[in-house]
Amino acid sequence: MSQSEKENQGSGEGKTQDMAIFSPPVVRSGAGALNRALFTKTVNLAAAAVNDNRLISKYRKELEHSKELLRQDRLSPIVNHPDKALADQGKKCLLLSPNVKAPEPETWGAALKEGVQKKELSVIPYELQLNYDYWTYHDIITSILPEELHDDIPSGFNTAGHVAHMNLRERYIPYKKVIAEVILDKTTNIRTVINKVDNVGAESEFRTFQYEVLAGPDDMQVQVTENACSFEFDYSKVYWNSKLEAEHRRLINMFEPGEVVCDVMAGIGPFAVPAGKKGVFVWANDMNPESNKYMQVAINRNKVSQYVRPICEDGRTFIHHAADSVLEAHKNGEHVLIAPKPPSRAKKAPKPEPKRVDIPPTISHFVMNLPATAIEFLGCYRGVYAGHEDLFSAESGRKLPLVHVHCFSFKADDETPLNDICERITKYLGFPVKPGNPDVEGEVAVHDVRDVAPAKRMFCASFRIPREVAFAERV
């Protein structure tokens, strides 16, 4: 070994070169069919052939400590002996780091040398065979795509059950089939890969989209579990975004058992159903009949029919009469009975009576998860409690509802998005607001939800309906 090679072994450059031997072969197959057979490679390594399997653990620890043991993702350092006869006898080897060379004892550490001297092991050449199954999605795609496309390799996608939903940029479209096949191979539980061919909502008021199947069957009937609830739906007919699970959970955590929540654009119930499971009364509306159908499926599946009421109408109409509907339910004495926990067998106390929980007279929260246009619905809150000022008297202790409205705005590090959102709320609500504490009239808390595009983010603005708005004369 030359002096420069020895120096490189101890340098970062040498380590990088060593690890490069595990990279897949470059297969610039372009937009053609994926040929998995081309992804094979022989990596020449050294191995410590341990004569007595009882010593494997000892030498593994020693070689790990000396950093001579192979440490490579998805590869076990313990392998069968390359000699089939010895392998049939159960003999094992420990794979060694690429900088250890079998015919060069000067590259061996003290543990290896001692093991050889004691005749407890021998250092032998080992041909490690790698194939398509070993490499990751990123490894395979990097070897297929031309270098000029390596800066932004498609990796993120939404999932809905067994469906991976991609939104490929134009320059990757020629490779869409290959990309989809590799995703299918490398992603657990994915059976179908689709690509969106238009913007969500571009052709549908229900936020559904046109798609093409890139790999797998055209099967869009999916099952999803989110926030401890099970959903089943046709992904091509309703809106679902797995990236919103944390936002769903954030708002659900704000709801208290026994409160009333009105979900204006409820979809199939990602807010409503888990909230119902928590003991929250939910009026859940969506104007898409398919969403309403699958919400009812989720309500029954998750056993929350006592708490969640599916409604199918325009969101503006829903807001106009939501308060009256809740108040009427309260006046009619609508309630749920919560069965008590059964007493332990050791106790002979009489069985306790079920707990009655009445629907309260007022709404605690409105949720408006339609970020493209929800702010434009805010004018509908004018007069929502007209004539019912007494419900919010000082003696009652009740507060006007909190509104949680999702929206899009600019991506910026300064106050620009907050000011933009407050200006739009002011315009449609007809009442001036500014960033601040949502419990203070005229102030709005803005939560940053997620990135949706390079210069666009999704936010959730929360505020209490001002008294001037809630008690205004109804139009």
UniProtKB/Swiss-Prot annotation:
<keyword id="KW-0808">Transferase</keyword>
<keyword id="KW-0963">Cytoplasm</keyword>
<dbReference type="GO" id="GO:0002939">
    <property type="term" value="P:tRNA N1-guanine methylation"/>
</dbReference>
<dbReference type="InterPro" id="IPR030382">
    <property type="entry name" value="MeTrfase_TRM5/TYW2"/>
</dbReference>
<comment type="subunit">
    <text>Monomer.</text>
</comment>
<dbReference type="GO" id="GO:0005759">
    <property type="term" value="C:mitochondrial matrix"/>
</dbReference>
<feature type="binding site">
    <location>
        <begin position="286"/>
        <end position="287"/>
    </location>
    <ligand>
        <name>S-adenosyl-L-methionine</name>
    </ligand>
</feature>
<keyword id="KW-0819">tRNA processing</keyword>
<dbReference type="InterPro" id="IPR056744">
    <property type="entry name" value="TRM5/TYW2-like_N"/>
</dbReference>
<dbReference type="InterPro" id="IPR025792">
    <property type="entry name" value="tRNA_Gua_MeTrfase_euk"/>
</dbReference>
<keyword id="KW-0949">S-adenosyl-L-methionine</keyword>
<dbReference type="GO" id="GO:0070901">
    <property type="term" value="P:mitochondrial tRNA methylation"/>
</dbReference>
<comment type="similarity">
    <text>Belongs to the class I-like SAM-binding methyltransferase superfamily. TRM5/TYW2 family.</text>
</comment>
<feature type="binding site">
    <location>
        <position position="369"/>
    </location>
    <ligand>
        <name>S-adenosyl-L-methionine</name>
    </ligand>
</feature>
<keyword id="KW-0539">Nucleus</keyword>
<keyword id="KW-0496">Mitochondrion</keyword>
<feature type="binding site">
    <location>
        <position position="248"/>
    </location>
    <ligand>
        <name>S-adenosyl-L-methionine</name>
    </ligand>
</feature>
<dbReference type="Pfam" id="PF02475">
    <property type="entry name" value="TRM5-TYW2_MTfase"/>
</dbReference>
<protein>
    <recommendedName>
        <fullName>tRNA (guanine(37)-N(1))-methyltransferase</fullName>
        <ecNumber>2.1.1.228</ecNumber>
    </recommendedName>
</protein>
<dbReference type="GO" id="GO:0005737">
    <property type="term" value="C:cytoplasm"/>
</dbReference>
<dbReference type="GO" id="GO:0005634">
    <property type="term" value="C:nucleus"/>
</dbReference>
<dbReference type="GO" id="GO:0008175">
    <property type="term" value="F:tRNA methyltransferase activity"/>
</dbReference>
<keyword id="KW-0489">Methyltransferase</keyword>
<dbReference type="Pfam" id="PF25133">
    <property type="entry name" value="TYW2_N_2"/>
</dbReference>
<feature type="binding site">
    <location>
        <begin position="314"/>
        <end position="315"/>
    </location>
    <ligand>
        <name>S-adenosyl-L-methionine</name>
    </ligand>
</feature>
<comment type="function">
    <text>Specifically methylates the N1 position of guanosine-37 in various cytoplasmic and mitochondrial tRNAs. Methylation is not dependent on the nature of the nucleoside 5' of the target nucleoside. This is the first step in the biosynthesis of wybutosine (yW), a modified base adjacent to the anticodon of tRNAs and required for accurate decoding.</text>
</comment>
<dbReference type="GO" id="GO:0052906">
    <property type="term" value="F:tRNA (guanine(37)-N1)-methyltransferase activity"/>
</dbReference>
<feature type="region of interest" description="Disordered">
    <location>
        <begin position="1"/>
        <end position="20"/>
    </location>
</feature>
<dbReference type="InterPro" id="IPR029063">
    <property type="entry name" value="SAM-dependent_MTases_sf"/>
</dbReference>
<dbReference type="InterPro" id="IPR056743">
    <property type="entry name" value="TRM5-TYW2-like_MTfase"/>
</dbReference>
